Structures are given as C-alpha cells and as structure tokens.
Design a protein with these regions (language model features):
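Negatively charged, low-complexity tracts enriched in Asp/Glu with abundant Ser/Thr
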Residues: 1-27
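General helical secondary-structure elements
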Residues: 2-5, 30-32, 47, 71
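Low-complexity, intrinsically disordered short peptide segments enriched in small/polar/basic residues
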Residues: 12-14, 44, 71, 75
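Compositionally biased, intrinsically disordered low-complexity segments
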Residues: 15-20, 35, 81, 85
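Intrinsic disorder/low-complexity segments
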Residues: 20-22, 37, 73
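A short, structured beta-strand/loop element
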Residues: 27-64
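Mixed-charge, Lys/Arg-enriched low-complexity segments
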Residues: 56-85
Length: 85
C-alpha cells in the first residue's frame, strides 16, 4: 500500500506510507503500518499496530491501535521482547 490518506482529525492529516496485514481467527486481522501525521507545524512518522475485523460486506473496521515512535532503540526493544516472551 503506497501513500494512502486514511483520515483527518482536526488539523492533523494522517497518511499511511506502507502497511502489511495478517489475518487470524474467523474475521480478524492485525495491521502493522508506517504512518505520517502532518500538521501546520510539521510532520512526524510513527509505527502503528492495529487490530481490526471484517464486516459481512468485507469492509474493514479497526478496534484498537498502538503507536510506536520511529526510534531505532524503541523498535529494537519491542521486537526483542516480542520474540523472547
């Protein structure tokens, strides 16, 4: 998925730069995405991990999301802990 605008909240524009999904269960999925939030003051990139589900018409709905700063140390820590737990 290349640069897709998903939505605006107030004066913040969110753009999905890249996203990958994995399905699990009957109609659930996890999405890991790199996103950019842009305001009048500038922009910020971050990683988003979201859980969602598919509606009967196959459209997607997101339930929960966790944002992770785009910091190599934090990303490394999270990846290491996920593998070791």
């Amino acid at each position: 998925m290349d640069e897709e605008t998903r939505g605006k909240r107030g004066d913040v524009e969110f753009v999905t730069i890249r996203a990958e999904k994995i399905n699990f269960g009957r109609n659930n999925f996890l999405e890991v995405a790199r996103k950019r939030a842009t305001t009048a003051e500038g922009s910020n990139e971050f990683i988003s991990v979201s859980r969602g589900y598919y509606l009967p018409d196959k459209s997607e709905r997101f339930k929960r999301s966790l944002t992770i700063p785009d910091d190599p140390g934090i990303k490394s820590f999270i990846a290491e802990k996920i593998k070791s737990l």
